[in-house]
Structures are given as structure tokens and as C-alpha cells.
């Protein structure tokens, strides 16, 4: 956070939630939220292990016996929740989603294809719950928050020469006064 939680207007002492993990995750200021220190370290190590050591490195390749051209019969039933679809197409169903609690209609993260790390950006129209049923539905429009989330991730991937895969099914742009304030900037 930038300001101390007790210095923010309307953030009264009993609340002071602007420094909390939930607030920061929903704001897009953190990539991953963990339950405890051990999980946080494991996720940090997982993320660091897939990234090139610097912007001039060629990237990280891993051994892969998963057939890139395999048939994925269940893929068609997961196209509305693209986080599930990305996991389906990735080597060994591995997907590291980032900023999962921010702009949930847009999915970003890393997958592996034929052993290579690939950035993935996709919009979703449904968020599936653990029971496999739609827990939340989204319009198939680009929002300002989703566009910023995607743009920052693509910029990050570009700075490390990580290729990006996109899965899109968009019918237009979100239209409201709030969206109009910044959507053009977010999309540029």
C-alpha cells in the first residue's frame, strides 16, 4: 500500500482493510495470495522457476512427454471459463494464474506448451465453482479493469520475450460513464 491504512479517508480504525491481502488482491496490486508463509514461498519459487533469469535469457524449457497435439475431449465444455480451458491445453494441465481476484472476467497467467513457458491471456464469461457449475457470469465485453490487467501482463511477458497465447470471445466494450473515463487508455 502507499498510504498507511489509518490515513485513508473512510477507512476507520475498526476496518483498516486497505493493507489486507483481500483488498490488495482485488485491486490487482498482488499476483498471488497465499494462506500461509509456506504456500507463499512455494508459489514464489514456482513463479521464479519459470521466468528467464533476465531479459536477454532465452527462457526456460522443461522436458515434456505430454503430446502437444493430443485430443482434449472436455475442452469444448470449458470454453466459458478459460482458466479451466488453459489448464486443459497446457502441458500436464499446469496453469499458474496471476491476479485471480482482480478483474475476474479476464484471465492471465502462465502455461507450458511443448515444454516452453507461454503467457496466457483470455476473457471468460463464467467462473466455475469447485462443483463445476457457474459460480459467476460475466458479459463478453472488454472492461477497463480487464484491459489494464491484460495489457500489464502482456507488457511483462514482452520484456522477457515470453510468447503470449490469447483466447478471446468478445462482443464489444463495456459501456458506462465509469468505463468511458479510462477504457480507451486501457486498450491502447
List where the protein language model places each region.
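Thiamine diphosphate
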Residues: 136-188
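Conserved catalytic cores of soluble enzyme domains
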Residues: 1-56, 162, 170-188
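Structured alpha-helical segments in the cores of large, soluble enzyme domains
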Residues: 12-21, 110-111, 150-160
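Intrinsically disordered, low-complexity segments enriched in small/flexible residues
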Residues: 34-144, 151
Amino acid at each position: 500500500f502507499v498510504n498507511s491504512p489509518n490515513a485513508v479517508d473512510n477507512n476507520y480504525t475498526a476496518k483498516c482493510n486497505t493493507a489486507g491481502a483481500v483488498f490488495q488482491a482485488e485491486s490487482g496490486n498482488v499476483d498471488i495470495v497465499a494462506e500461509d508463509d509456506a504456500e507463499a514461498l512455494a508459489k514464489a519459487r514456482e513463479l521464479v522457476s519459470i521466468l528467464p533469469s533476465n531479459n536477454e535469457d532465452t527462457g526456460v524449457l522443461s522436458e515434456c512427454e505430454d503430446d502437444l497435439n493430443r485430443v482434449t475431449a472436455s475442452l469444448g465444455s470449458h470454453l466459458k471459463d478459460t482458466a479451466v480451458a488453459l489448464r486443459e491445453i497446457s502441458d500436464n494441465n499446469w496453469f499458474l494464474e496471476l491476479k485471480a481476484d482482480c478483474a475476474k472476467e479476464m484471465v492471465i497467467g502462465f502455461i507450458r506448451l511443448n515444454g516452453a513457458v507461454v503467457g496466457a491471456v483470455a476473457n471468460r464469461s463464467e467462473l466455475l465453482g469447485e462443483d463445476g457449475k457457474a459460480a459467476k457470469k460475466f458479459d463478453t465485453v472488454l472492461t477497463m479493469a480487464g484491459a489494464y490487467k491484460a495489457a500489464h501482463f502482456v507488457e511483462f511477458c514482452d520484456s522477457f520475450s515470453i510468447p503470449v497465447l490469447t483466447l478471446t470471445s468478445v462482443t464489444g466494450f463495456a459501456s458506462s460513464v465509469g468505463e468511458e473515463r479510462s477504457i480507451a487508455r486501457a486498450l491502447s
